[in-house]
């Protein structure tokens, strides 16, 4: 499955399969080096990006705890 393209993710969607297939919809200032497909969010100011990769494996922890 390789390296997860994000260390953490707040807006993560994963399948219920084992292993899970996960996507992260967080808006980032820049994608990580591990992200292969980085997409710019249209009309974002300042510019924001979303890693378009699908990761197969253990879901990432959340970046921020929701209170």
Swiss-Prot record:
Q: Name one GO cellular component term.
A: extracellular region
Q: What Pfam families would the database entry show?
A: Bowman-Birk_leg (PF00228)
Which branch of life, at top level?
Eukaryota
What GO molecular functions are on record for this protein?
A: serine-type endopeptidase inhibitor activity
Q: Where is this site: Reactive bond for trypsin?
A: 16-17
State the CDD domains in the record.
BBI
Alphabetized Gene3D superfamilies for the sequence: Cysteine Protease (Bromelain) Inhibitor, subunit H
Disulfide bridges in this chain: 8-63, 9-24, 14-22, 31-38, 35-51
Which terms are listed as keywords in the entry? Disulfide bond, Protease inhibitor, Serine protease inhibitor
The family classification in the record reads:
Belongs to the Bowman-Birk serine protease inhibitor family.
Official protein name in the record: Bowman-Birk type trypsin inhibitor 3
State the organism named in the record.
Setaria italica (Foxtail millet)
């Amino acid at each position: 499955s390789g390296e997860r393209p994000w260390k953490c993710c707040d807006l993560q969607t994963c399948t219920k399969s084992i292993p899970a297939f996960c996507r992260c919809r967080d808006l980032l200032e820049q994608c990580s080096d591990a992200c292969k497909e980085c997409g710019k969010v249209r009309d974002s100011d300042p510019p924001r990006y979303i890693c378009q990769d699908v990761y197969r494996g253990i879901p990432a922890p959340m970046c921020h705890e929701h209170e």
